[in-house]
Amino acid sequence: LTRLADIDTGPLRLHRGICIVTPATPSSDAPSQIGLVPLQNELEKVQVELDSLKAEINFLRRRDETLNFYMNRLDEELRLAARLQQDFLPRTLPQVGPLRFHTLFRPAGYVSGDLYDVFRLDESHVGFYMADAVGHGMPAALLTMFIKNALVTKQISAEGYRLLDPGEALARLNDKLVDQNLTQATFATAVYGSINAKTLVCRFARAGHPFPLLMRGDGSVLNLQSDGGLLGIFPNDVYEDRQIQLRAGDRLFIYTDGIEVAFADDHALNTQQWRVELEHRREMPVERVLLELSENLDRETGSLAPKDDLSIVVAEVRPDA
């Protein structure tokens, strides 16, 4: 048997750490035989490496199983949160006098940072609001749930009740958000308003939210502007009350900025394309308009992974009012 370092001549073959030496001619110094030389040290090193590799593979397999377990549990919790958030949305929409309400809701994930509601304030008034919490996912969804519970629309006393002006309602909501002293940046935009079903006077206030869009029955389109900053930033902020007279055939669109992103043209967050989409469907029933908008979004590239939540509430004054 000859170690590799002692070989001077002769054919040499290496196979998996085994040195096989075949002397060309027998000599008096070396016996005439074929030597199989296990490189014991090398084999031991290889075995150690194999054992280490097996241990690492087993560790990774166990970690993968643990990750899958927690991912499955997270998926179940998010699905539960999505069902709970759906319970915060109105199951039915009020129909009061000539007023009809329609909605479109497309969350970007399991849960949404968008929230809306339409509800009776009293026999004559219908209230509506839409809120959009910063960000996406669970933190944004939890913030919208807080907003729903914290928004006060009427003040009740022993003598009766008083409907809060929209600006006052948003100011109270803002102060409640500020008082939370949350460590993370938590703020939201919102629109709150009410419509008198008898007089068709719409009163509203806005907190950093996209302007409501009013499509008149005569074909004109108006952005309903009012001043007011984001909710949850500055205490004692003021939100401007505005009002407008609605007429038969009018459609009032309240929406989150996800609709602007979804229909953005070459200029991001440009509402022009969004308005064009609506104007092309002026003669359609509102239900059909929202259905076609949703179908168009489904055909867009990246529709399976939308960039933002998308919500629309439409207040329609029936043409025969």
Task: Specify the residue positions occupied by each region the protein language model found.
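Non-catalytic regulatory/interaction regions at protein termini and inter-domain linkers
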Residues: 1-30, 91, 249, 287-307, ...
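Short linear motifs in intrinsically disordered/low-complexity regions
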Residues: 7-9, 16, 30, 52, ...
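PAS-family sensory domains
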Residues: 15-20, 129-131, 255
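Amphipathic alpha-helical coiled-coil "transmission" helices that mediate dimerization
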Residues: 26-76
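Interdomain signal-transducing alpha-helices
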Residues: 40, 44-47, 143, 147, ...
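Residue-level detector of alpha-helix boundaries and kinks
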Residues: 52, 69-70, 158, 278, ...
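… and, occasionally, acidic/histidine-rich disordered N-termini of signaling adaptors
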Residues: 56-251, 302-321
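C-terminal catalytic subdomain
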Residues: 245-254, 259-321
